[in-house]
Amino acid sequence: MRDTIAKLFKPSNIGTAVFFALNFGLVLLIFAPYSFTPYGIATLLLVYTLTVAISLSPVGEWMLSVFAGAKEIKRTDVKLKLVPLLEAVYNNAKEKSPNMVDSIHLKMIPGNETNAYAIGRRTICVTEGVLNLSDEMIMGIFAHEIGHIANRHSQIQLLIGGANIFISTFILILKAIAWMITGTFGLFALGSRKFTTGCLIGLVGSLSTILVYLWVKLCGLFLMWSSRKNEFVADEYAYSIGFGNQLAYVLDNVIETQTKNGFLKALYSSHPERNERIARLQELGVTYSRW
C-alpha cells in the first residue's frame, strides 16, 4: 500500500495525483462548511479510506476482472501454451524487481481481437486473439503488462476505480440537490405562472448538467495524460527485462495503438501513438526494424 501511494507521485502519475486532489476538493466543497471541521474531515477520510481499502483488496481486483469479462482458463492446451511463456517473462522480471508479487494470475477474455490488460496486484487478462501469435510476440505482450504490475500502474487503476465510486456518489448528491432546487422553483412557477421563474428552473437544471459534464471531462484529461505516460514506462520495463524487440514487433504489426485524428481526441487517448512508442524503444536500444 505504501509503495503504491509512493508511486502515485512519480512524474508519470502527476495527472492521476491531480485527479485525486480535484475530486477530494470537490467533496470538501459539496459539504462545506461541515467538511472543514475536524470531525467532518475525519469522517470523509474514513469513508474514502474504506473505499480505497476495498478497491485494493482481492475483492476489488476480482470485481474489476468481472467487469472486464475475464474468466479462468480451463483448457489444458491453452494453459500449456501461455503459462510457460508467462513464467519465463516473470522470472526475468523477478530478478529486476525482487519485491514483485510471488505469482501472476492469468485470465482469458473472450474475443478475437488481440489485447491484454494488467489488473490489480497480480492479474493479467489476455484476449483469445493472443493465442494466434507466436511465442516471442506473446512474451513481448506479457513483459509490457508485467511492467504495469511492477510499477503499480494496475493497482493505481484500482484506486481510481474506488475514487470514481466515491466521487460518483457525491456527484449524484450534488445533482439531486440541484434538481430539488429546480423542482421547488418549478412548483412555485406553477403557482405563480411567472415566466422569469420558469427560465430560472431551466437555467439551474442545465447548469448542473453542464458543470458535471465539464468536471468529468477535466478529470478524464488528467487521467489520460498519466495513462499515456505509464505506457512508456511499461514499454521501458519490457525492454529492461529483455523483451523490447518482441514488444516493438507486436506494436508495429499486431496491436492497434494509433491515436485518432484531432487534438482533443489525442488528448483523451489512453495510449500514445504507436510509432512514438516504437521510436522510444529504439532510443533505448531496441534493434527492431520493419524492413
Residue spans for each PLM region:
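Residue-level signature of catalytic and energy-coupling elements of molecular machines
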Residues: 61, 126, 144, 234, ...
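A short, glycine/Asx- and small/polar-enriched loop/turn
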Residues: 115-122
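Acidic/histidine metal-binding catalytic segments
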Residues: 103-105, 159-160, 244-254
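Hydrophobic or amphipathic, alpha-helical segments that drive membrane association/targeting
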Residues: 1-114, 164-229, 256-260, 284-291
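Catalytic Zn2+-binding segment of zinc metalloproteases
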Residues: 130, 146-165, 243-244
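Short pre-active-site segment immediately N-terminal to the catalytic Zn-binding motif
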Residues: 125-140
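Active-site His/Glu-centered metal-binding helix of metallohydrolases
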Residues: 142-150, 233, 237
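Pan-zinc metallopeptidase signature
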Residues: 226-230, 243-248, 268-291
